[in-house]
């Protein structure tokens, strides 16, 4: 029987913890929350300890932290409407421009682009212009409501965003004029889309929502053998699977493991659930099964989950209950 084994419970933040992010090497992670601080944790022997506290970068709650692909930089998105860039435990740049809370931040695969999104309904794309310099390359106003999450495609410079307007949007740079355009709108959820994550090759996307469902989307490129029409020769995204009935409240985060293909969800019912694609799953109509559920993973809402990028089967979670938990999937 497959189950999640709790390996560590970590405390240190004051108040709710909003975000956790594994370092690309998988041997440390960053956390952020209501206390306006970022903590960097690493494993010492068999104990996870806070190595550094970064507390001078933001004036309000920090909503999300993300490491650059090289692992040298950390970006933090805050309710103070700024995004901070950290290097060697120092705040080296502060990105200003959003009118309201910054909800999410994401680095492109190359590390040359950074995306941010906000309650002001906009998505900003920043170019890394040199040492600690960032230039705004685009301001995208495609959403009609608060934008909750931005995530870059794992291999291409394609950006996905999730919003309070119930949609997901895809953005890419135009080959004609170098402008960033909205290339697709993914509509199927009936309430806020809280989070999204690509699979390993970026051909599929998982989304989670306030409507208590997970949805799997597939990319259909021009000339695809499924016969899906692609107007203007742009990639079309279709919802190919809806997972409902397993969550009783809003699903706040989702993580698609790049090594195992397992999907983890973080829910407002205090639970964490792991889904596996069925062995007889079809490409254009995939099926997933609930592999295991930790119904009381935390004492309050689970805000974030993320699979370790190096250690297969290791999962981290954080919650309104002020704890971070590290889990191991045991088969």
Swiss-Prot record:
One of its GO terms (biological process) is protein maturation. WD repeats lie at residues 12-51, 57-96, 97-136, 142-181, 188-227, 246-285, 297-331. GO terms for cellular component: cytosolic [4Fe-4S] assembly targeting complex; metallochaperone complex. Keywords: Repeat, WD repeat. The keyword Repeat applies. Signal peptide: none annotated. It comes from the Eukaryota. The keyword Cell division does not apply. InterPro entries: CIAO1/Cia1, G-protein_beta_WD-40_rep, WD40/YVTN_repeat-like_dom_sf, WD40_repeat_CS, WD40_repeat_dom_sf, WD40_rpt. Belongs to the WD repeat CIA1 family. Essential component of the cytosolic iron-sulfur (Fe/S) protein assembly machinery. Required for the maturation of extramitochondrial Fe/S proteins. PANTHER family: CYTOSOLIC IRON-SULFUR PROTEIN ASSEMBLY PROTEIN CIAO1-RELATED (PTHR19920:SF0), WD40 PROTEIN CIAO1 (PTHR19920). HAMAP family: ciao1 (MF_03037). This is Probable cytosolic iron-sulfur protein assembly protein Ciao1. It comes from Drosophila virilis.
């Amino acid at each position: 029987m497959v189950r999640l084994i709790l390996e560590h419970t970590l405390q240190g933040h004051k108040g709710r913890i909003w975000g956790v992010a594994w370092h690309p090497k998988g041997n440390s992670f960053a956390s952020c929350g209501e206390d306006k601080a970022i903590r960097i944790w690493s494993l010492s022997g068999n104990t996870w300890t806070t190595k550094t506290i970064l507390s001078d970068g933001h004036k309000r709650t920090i909503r999300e932290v993300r490491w650059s692909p090289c692992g040298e930089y950390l970006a933090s998105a805050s309710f103070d409407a700024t995004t901070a860039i950290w290097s060697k435990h120092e705040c080296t740049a502060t990105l200003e421009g959003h009118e309201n809370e910054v909800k999410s931040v994401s680095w492109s695969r190359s590390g040359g682009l950074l995306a941010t999104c906000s309650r002001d309904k906009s998505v900003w794309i920043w170019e890394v212009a040199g040492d600690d310099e960032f230039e705004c390359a685009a301001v995208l106003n495609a959403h009609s409501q608060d934008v909750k999450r931005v995530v870059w495609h794992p291999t291409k410079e394609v950006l996905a965003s999730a919003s309070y307007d119930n949609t997901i949007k895809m953005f890419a740079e135009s080959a004609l004029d170098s402008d960033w355009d909205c290339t697709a709108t993914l509509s199927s959820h009936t309430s806020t889309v809280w989070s999204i994550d690509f699979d390993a090759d970026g051909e599929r996307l998982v989304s989670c929502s306030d409507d208590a469902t997970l949805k799997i989307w597939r990319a259909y490129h021009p000339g695809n053998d499924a016969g899906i029409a692609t107007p203007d020769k742009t990639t079309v995204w279709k919802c190919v699977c809806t997972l409902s009935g397993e969550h009783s409240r809003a699903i706040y985060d989702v993580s698609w493991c790049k090594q195992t293909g397992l999907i983890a969800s973080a829910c407002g019912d205090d639970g964490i659930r792991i889904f596996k694609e069925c062995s007889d799953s079809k490409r254009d109509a995939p099926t997933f099964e609930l592999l295991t559920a930790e119904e009381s993973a935390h004492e309050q809402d689970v805000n974030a989950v993320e699979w370790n990028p190096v250690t297969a089967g290791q999962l981290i979670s954080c919650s309104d209950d002020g704890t971070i938990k590290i889990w191991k999937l045991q088969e």
